[in-house]
């Protein structure tokens, strides 16, 4: 059964437009509360958020909806998505809720959920919530209404958890790091994590005003980080997105490294320490160069659909530990139950410190193939698969590339966009074919 409200990462949209309105979000929380009470008499949920101005409004709506269903609420304030996942598990809560639209600009917002174990919830749970949404509310009686409170030092608890994943035998002393938190949920957390492990930290993107989240900073706009690393002669740059679940890094020369390269580094580091790495899960977007480098190390790469939930599902199915996306969602399931930009950065830095080599030296033998991505806006109800102009162009390009490249055309799971990607050894050729396909998509 198709989901009506839930996308690949919760429910997301423009604030003030369905479904991201206070009345719907209240109803959503009430429906979730009713689902929780089917198996638990007095559930408790944690609610965290990023720094969007709309977070205040949506937080209040969620609190009211849960309380009206007889569910207690613990407010965490601004906290990275993986921090909410961690505290949900650590506090033995029934559910974790995050108010965030991740890397999107401030006019958007969203709601996503974590299980009591700090993991993404299955489709069946989301369908149960949608069914409850279609039913009439069943308000709890006055004696059964839920309560709300704030958790003291939620940020400090999460900081200590992040630090616990970094080897106690190692330090970041003598290392200068520029940290860009995208004016998002990690603004008051990320600089402290690296500082408390010994690094000299220069913070940018750490002054949220409710409107500037992800604006020209962070993992989706790394130019600011590159400039800051070069200007301050830093050793590393770390860029997170608005909810701090994705990571991009920069070396001392100002070169940017994406999730594909960092995923390979994490696998190679484990191999160098004699750990068993039977395989790694990437996505349809994972660069061919990484696949070949892993293969040379005797490690299989399996491609899942784009979206960290699909990477997680494949990891669980195979009982593997490492996976990730080009965008910087990296998963190390023996470190955390979900993607965590801060913990991923610590694992990369730990590998470099332990090996006594810079990021550039560590990854010098991995050179990504040129990959050109063009986004085409989709109109409401537009079926790109029925576009015969695009389908004919797709067949033609695939025939021309043969075994020397890849083409991927897919609809975004979070935005009304068609993503056209072409990967081949020649950048000009990749760009030509990608724009040719994008033009065909628009023409149809």
From Swiss-Prot:
GO terms for biological process: carbohydrate metabolic process; peptidoglycan biosynthetic process; UDP-N-acetylglucosamine biosynthetic process. The modification Phosphoserine is found at residue 102. It catalyses: alpha-D-glucosamine 1-phosphate = D-glucosamine 6-phosphate. This is Phosphoglucosamine mutase. It is an enzyme of class 5 (isomerase). Belongs to the phosphohexose mutase family. Activated by phosphorylation. Its EC number is 5.4.2.10. InterPro entries: A-D-PHexomutase_a/b/a-I, A-D-PHexomutase_a/b/a-I/II/III, A-D-PHexomutase_a/b/a-II, A-D-PHexomutase_a/b/a-III, A-D-PHexomutase_C, A-D-PHexomutase_C_sf, Alpha-D-phosphohexomutase_SF, GlmM_bact. HAMAP family: GlmM_B. One of its GO terms (molecular function) is phosphomannomutase activity. Binds 1 Mg(2+) ion per subunit. Catalyzes the conversion of glucosamine-6-phosphate to glucosamine-1-phosphate. The gene is glmM. It comes from Paracidovorax citrulli (strain AAC00-1) (Acidovorax citrulli). GO terms for cellular component: cytosol. CDD domains: GlmM (cd05802). The active site is at residue 102. NCBIfam families: glmM (TIGR01455), PRK10887.1 (NF008139). The keyword Oxidoreductase does not apply. Mg(2+) binds at residues 102, 241, 243, 245. Keywords: Isomerase, Magnesium, Metal-binding, Phosphoprotein. Its cofactor is Mg(2+).
